[in-house]
Each structure stands twice: as C-alpha cells, then as structure tokens.
Amino acid sequence: MKDPKSYRSNGIGASVKRLEDDRYLRGRGKFVGDIRLPGMLEIAFVRSPLAHANIKNIHKPEGVEESVFICEDLISVSGIKADSGLPGFKSSVQPILASKKVRHVGEPVVACVAKNRAAAEDIADSIHIEFEELPAIHDMKTAMDAGNPLIHESWDKNCFLETNVETNFDEAISSASSIVKRTFQTARQCMAPMEGRAVVAQWDNQLSQLTVHSATQMPHIVRTGLSECLGLEEGKIRVVAPDVGGGFGYKGILLAEEVFAGWLAMKTGRPVRWLEDRREHLT
C-alpha cells in the first residue's frame, strides 16, 4: 500500500501554488473602480437613515433639478421582483428608488449625478427628505408577532414562505440521552470585502446595447435581472465581471444601484459609475 504521505506532494492535501497572486501584488488587477471612460458621470445616493418610515416630502435646492432623480422619474423601470416556484411563496418587489415608504436603513431614496463623485455627494448633501417615522421590527421573532408592522402591506404576516418537515419529534426527544435548551442571538452581518459593490454602465446607441461592468459574483443573474427591470432583451445586455475584490455572497444578487446605473446610461447616452463607499456598505 502506498504511503498516504506521498500524496501530499501532488494530490490530496498538497500545497498548491497560487497562480493569480502575482499581478494583484504588483497592482495589475483591473477592478470596476479602475475603469475610466470619456464623459463618465458619477452617482451618489441619498439613503434612508430610518428602518421604517413614510416619505412625506423631498426638497431639492434650485439649480440641481436635472442632476437629481427620484422614484417618479423611473416610471418605465420595473422593480426587482423576488419570486419563486415554491408553493406558498409570497413574492415582493423592491423599488429601484424608494416610493412613498422606506423599509430598511440605507434604502436608496434619491440619486444624484455629477461629473465626479465629490460633486455628486455635494448635491446629495443638499437634499432634504421629510420622513414620518413608523414602528420598526428588529428581529425575526418580533416580526412574527401579531399586531406588529407589516413589511409589505399586501401580506397577512411577515413570512414569505412556510414549509413543513414531517418527523416524530416527540419520540426523538424521549429517546435522547440529553436535551439542551438555549436561546441564541446573533448580530447583523456585514461582509466587509476590500472592494465594495461597484458598477459602470455604458449604452451604445448604434448597437442598442447596454454594457455593464459589475463587481458581481453572478453576471448571468445580473443580466437576466437587468433585462426584466429595463425591458431589454438579454441579447442586448452584456455584463462583464472584472476582477472582484472579495464578495462572500453579498455580490451574488442584482442590486437596485445596478438597475439605476443601466437606466441612467440609456437615458443620458453617457457612461455612468457608482462605487459603494464603506459607510454605504456598513449600513
């Protein structure tokens, strides 16, 4: 019988030399933040500071109207639909920009556009939103209690799917050698990769094609979602995932910011970019 230790040189348990590190260590990686296109616009979002609130009014200072966008400007854009073929699944729609109500801290309400990120953030700082704060839910147990606020008013309760697993639980408990009962609570999670979410969108009017560079782990999901939200054929959308500076799962979904960037590129005919900053990521 062959000595198991011999497999460590070229088989299971072997130390495999990494081939991709050299160019990263030399600063030769190509991330979305490295993309520079002529005439590119930058986006900054005004986000909700509250977990649950009605939007009463949005005040824009004079002179920035053409650089500020709210949900009413996106009437041709569909929200991101959460749906499933599972029996009993309750579907929901996430608006690209919050309409009438916000449902979580950090939800984008207003998008501001300028020639650079600093100017876009200056415009965002000048926007004032009047909120009517509503009771919020902070954990799953409270969310299921009767009488607490509904996340989606059309639902009868805050549960999007119920499933049943049949087993003889009482028999298993009665035959167990020991039973441990504990209640555990975990804090909210934050992936904190080196690179945040990021997108560059460019519209080619001659080809009627949208090209999106996204820091995504699932470019095909992004392409399908953009097609549904923007009303474009998938064949007219090209999603490019360049080097991605970490993801850990949170870059595996379609983002409202990606949809807005695609729409804005189509509207203006200019390339647009949004780079998530650390504060946006943490909220």
Where are these regions (language model features)?
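Short gly/pro/ser/thr-enriched loop/turn and capping motifs at secondary-structure boundaries
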Residues: I75-G79, G245, H281-L282
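Cysteine-centered functional microenvironments
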Residues: G106, V240, D277-T283
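Acidic-residue sensor for enzyme active/binding pockets
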Residues: E20, E195, E257-E258, E280
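Short Pro/Gly-enriched beta-strand edge/turn motifs at strand-loop
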Residues: K81-S84, S174-Q189, R273-L282
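Alpha-helical support elements that line or immediately flank enzyme active sites
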Residues: F45-L74, V110-E130, V199-P242, G247-T268
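Short beta-strand-initiation
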Residues: K30, L41, L97, E107, ...
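Flexible, low-hydrophobicity surface segments
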Residues: M1-K157, I179, K267, W274
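Helix-loop-helix junctions that connect adjacent transmembrane helices in secondary transporters/permeases
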Residues: D145-L230
